[in-house]
Amino acid sequence: MPSTYNPVRGVLLLVGSLLARFGLVERERVRRATDLSWPRVVTGLARMSKSTADVAMVGLALGPTAIAGVGFAAPFWELVFALGGGVAGGTIGMVSQRYGADADEELAVTVTTSAVVVLGLTLPLTAAYWAGPGLLVDLVGTGAEAVEYGTRYLRVVALGVPFAALNLIGSRTLVGADDAWTPMLLRAGGAVVNIVLNAVFVFGFGLGVVGAAMGTVIANVLVTVGFAVGLARGRLPVIGAFPVRIPVSRPFLDRELGRDLAETGAPLVGANLARTGAQFPRLFIVGLFGPGVVSAYVVALRVRALLDTPNWGLSLASSSLVGQALGDGDEAEATVWAETVLRLSVGVYLVVAATLLPFSRGIARLFVSDPAVLPLVTVFVAVACASVAFRGVDGGSTGPLRASGDTRWPFYAQLAGMYLFALPLAYLGHVTALGELALYASLVVETAVPAAVTYYRFRSGTWRVVSRSYRPDAALDD
């Protein structure tokens, strides 16, 4: 792992050192968690920045209507990450336990089984997006021109769906094997390629939204090839050795491992679908407030997604470190790792929220210049900065639950936060005098409720008991 200083790693270590001064964490544990986390955080920053740049390029080339069209197609693309991310969330727990127990053969079959499962889930999406993009976009979009832009974008980006899902499996496999550096290089490199290709296709060839979609597809294919070759050969030129190798001449499916993967991954898929699926009714409800509020709300969500990137590393680092300890049969060590990363995560998110909150107006100016809309966007950005603090608790608590196989509670947490609180509260703003205040509150409860639920489950300690059913020995005895 390279030791060169970088800002992301520096912030994580700074927060960890402050916590260590108060005796809340051990410095060496913070350092190991940081080394595993920061490459994933950089990957998250690259991906979220790429999404922002994509929209900016389309807007500069074609105007706000094209941005709206891509926005209408975006929830369908995010379904890929809901499905693939859920399966990959089960994969990382199973991989980390087998890596900790040196069960190399089981680890390899776990990865190939995960790949087959994720292809089975996402190939139907590819077919649907290619065959009927207009029908799908029209379900959530308004305006013939915007819907047409969204339709053209979705049809082309459909070709990248299975590759994006496979990249999640490859990334989580390496993180589960204590290597976050390699996935960062591959996926962040893919994000850079994506931005460059989009600039060429959108501006150089004038392909508009189709060019943006083509850049996304090609970049995802290249990253998938990198993961596949690296895992099959155990190394890649320039990048170097992989911590695990997945031989191609072996059975690719194992029914018992597939059952364990389904049991651990299905609730995570459900939790992701609860979050992603809510984008559809949420867009409809916010649309009732008018276009100005819609633009402000979308900006707030983009800002919060960018600020939420620490969980890309910290939550998965927790899953990996906790899973390895559980795979070794050391529940006490697993608990210490879980508490360490949770405290580090909470500290990082509090620092991020407190640092950026005073700059809400400046952040808003990066997205809009209209003085009539700027104050509203500023308030939404401020609320987004405040609400993201709860994601530190949620991500830090979900990590050990994911590692142990106790994945139902994060699913329940997402359902409660979005469907029992956030969406009804947002609609209440439309039918009462609360107005935008209800939307502000919905942004907060959307993160606060899941944080409370997952933290409660983590503190109960039940996850340690659940993990005993999914450890390598248990799998072999079934």
Regions found by a protein language model. Give the residues of each.
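Generic alpha-helical transmembrane segments of integral inner-membrane proteins
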Residues: 41, 45, 49, 53, ...
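Short alpha-helical transmembrane segments in multi-pass integral membrane proteins
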Residues: 1-37, 95-160, 207-265, 322-387, ...
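N-terminal transmembrane alpha-helices
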Residues: 24-61, 75-90, 94, 119-126, ...
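Short runs within selected transmembrane alpha-helices of multi-pass transporters and secretion channels
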Residues: 81, 85, 153-175, 183-191, ...
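Transmembrane helical elements of multi-pass membrane transporters/channels
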Residues: 35-58, 156, 219-223, 227, ...
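Hydrophobic/aromatic residues within transmembrane alpha-helices of membrane transport systems
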Residues: 42, 46, 54-58, 70, ...
